[in-house]
């Protein structure tokens, strides 16, 4: 997410009324309401609290909406759903790990997310956060291995698919990188930086095939 998109989303969150309580069935109905964009915005936002992994397909569809607020809320809600394990201790550790990442305490964060993975190997976001840290440490093979685990558990994880692309760029495999970026964009076409990188790679590969570079 770019800085501009983050500011836009923050403004939308401030303007939109917060849901009083989580009602998944109601929120899904709102998201699917083709007669009211306000209802779809409300549903897209509220599913961040009430939604489950089973609601991801509905949110993926909403990522392709014409209304920018619906798209932004849907993306945020997907991340919120992904970040809930259903295990209070894992969720506590997850918050600790995110704080460690923010503080750039890489080794401590790796250990925290490794603890999460050992306790709840089915929790895809534990693998994703560790993959991110490994990437930042330059441990690309380990990061790739964790990305495999993420996508195996959550095939809609556009963040992990984008991560694959970033890793393969570092490994000097632009064609493979582009393939993963395009897979991420097929799920979430709102990833501006990913789209810009994909455009650069397409031009690079065209020039390479023509023998001009």
Put a short name on every predicted segment.
Residues 21-32, 52-62, 87-94:
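Amphipathic alpha-helical scaffolding segments comprising HEAT/armadillo-like alpha-solenoid repeats
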Residues 37, 90, 124-125, 158-159, ...:
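Helix-start (N-cap) detector for alpha-helical repeat units in TPR-like alpha-solenoids
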Residues 49, 80-84, 102, 136, ...:
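Register position in tetratricopeptide repeats
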Residues 99, 178-213:
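Terminal, low-structured helical/coil segments at or just beyond the last alpha-helical repeat
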């Amino acid at each position: 997410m770019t800085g501009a998109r983050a500011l836009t989303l923050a403004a939308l969150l401030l303007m939109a009324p917060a849901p009083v309580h989580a009602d998944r069935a109601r929120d899904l109905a709102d998201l699917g309401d083709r007669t009211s964009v306000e209802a779809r915005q409300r549903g897209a936002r509220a599913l961040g609290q009430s939604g489950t992994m089973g609601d991801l397909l509905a949110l993926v569809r909403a990522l392709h909406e014409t209304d920018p607020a619906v798209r932004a809320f849907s993306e945020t809600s997907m991340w919120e759903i992904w970040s809930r394990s259903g295990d209070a201790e894992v969720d506590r550790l997850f918050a600790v790990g995110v704080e460690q990442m923010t503080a750039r305490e890489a080794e401590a964060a790796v250990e925290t997310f490794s603890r999460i993975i050992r306790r709840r190997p089915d929790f895809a976001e534990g693998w994703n956060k560790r993959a991110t840290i490994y990437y930042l440490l330059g441990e690309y093979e380990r990061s790739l291995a964790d990305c495999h685990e993420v996508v195996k558990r959550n095939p809609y994880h556009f963040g992990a698919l984008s991560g694959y692309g970033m890793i393969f760029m570092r490994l000097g495999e632009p064609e493979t990188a582009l393939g993963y970026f395009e897979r991420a964009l097929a799920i979430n076409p709102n990833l501006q930086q990913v789209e810009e990188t994909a455009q650069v790679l397409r031009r690079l590969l065209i020039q390479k095939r023509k023998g001009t570079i």
